[in-house]
Each structure stands twice: as structure tokens, then as C-alpha cells.
Amino acid sequence: MIAIYPGSFDPITLGHLDLIQRGSRLFERVIVAVLRNPNKTPLFSVQQRLEQIRLSTQHLPNVEVDSFDGLTVNYAQMRHAQVLLRGLRAVSDFEVELQMAHTNKTLSTQIETVFLATSNEYSFLSSSVVREIARFGGSIDHLVPPHIALDIYQCYNHNSPMLNPISTEAIPPLKNISVEREA
């Protein structure tokens, strides 16, 4: 059985990758499908995202990476997929995803939506959270693969926050601070 895991993946996170890995154990093939959405201004181009995802999933032989535009169900039919794979982080995700699943069912009765609960450690994680943290100079090293973290830091002209080798907690780089003393 072929499953499509659609999304913008801008950027792909460890939460997405956890879902892909788990899906790859459930389905014969998982196609990670990057949506080309002309109405959004992404951090990374579709081509960059495809390459980032390929590097992140190269150890999974039954995972393929592709891009598409238009309706997800049309793409799924074109790829002969029977399942749309979706992750659920919270109840709010469920409401939106359930509506989408019902809508997709009205468009194609041949395609089922399968929901996987996000692993606890990624239940808060989204691409927008990663972008927001990085934009303000925070460490995202624990949220995305290393090669993607570097790409993101470059987009925001930040260096990777230095890690304390003892505690592995992010330590902000020291800044030159001049202190004036009263005489």
C-alpha cells in the first residue's frame, strides 16, 4: 500500500521525520509530497526542501520525495496511493485534519486518511515554531536535522548557538559590552 505524506515542510522538522519513519514501517512505500503553493512565501524553495528531505530520509529505502501542486487527492490518484498520512499533535489538529479528511473523501472515495499521533517529544513542534525561534536567534539544533539547522541559520544570518560541552544547553554567544564606571 502506498501512502502520501503531504505538506509544505518549510522546514521539515524532527517531528515530521519521526512520522515519516513510523509511516515507513506501516506502508510499502511513503511518498513525502512537498506542496508547491504560489500563495505562500517560503523560507526555502521547493527544490531546496526536496533536497533537505532527501538527505534526511536517505536511510529509509521505501521513502520517496516529490513535489506537487493542486489537490492532494488528485496527486494521490496520479501516484496510485491509497492513503494520505497525517500527523496529529493536539485536539486542535484533529478538528482541522478531520474536516480535511471528510472533504478529501467527497473528492475521492478510493483514498483513506490515516492519522498518527505525534510522539510526545514533538507534540509542540511545527515548522513555524522552528522559523520563529531561528528568526530571533534561538537554537533549533534539537528541532531539525543538523544540515537543515545550518541552512536555517544561514537564512537568518545567525551562527549556530554555541553549545556548552558539559550541559549541552545552548549558550548565547558573548557580546562586547562596554561598562562605564563612575569616578
Swiss-Prot record:
GO terms for cellular component: cytoplasm. One of its GO terms (molecular function) is pantetheine-phosphate adenylyltransferase activity. ATP binds at residues 8-9, 16, 87-89, 97, 122-128. One of its GO terms (biological process) is coenzyme A biosynthetic process. Keywords: ATP-binding, Coenzyme A biosynthesis, Cytoplasm, Magnesium, Nucleotide-binding, Nucleotidyltransferase, Transferase. It comes from Nostoc punctiforme (strain ATCC 29133 / PCC 73102). It is an enzyme of class 2 (transferase). It is found in: Cytoplasm. This is Phosphopantetheine adenylyltransferase. The keyword RNA-binding does not apply. Belongs to the bacterial CoaD family.
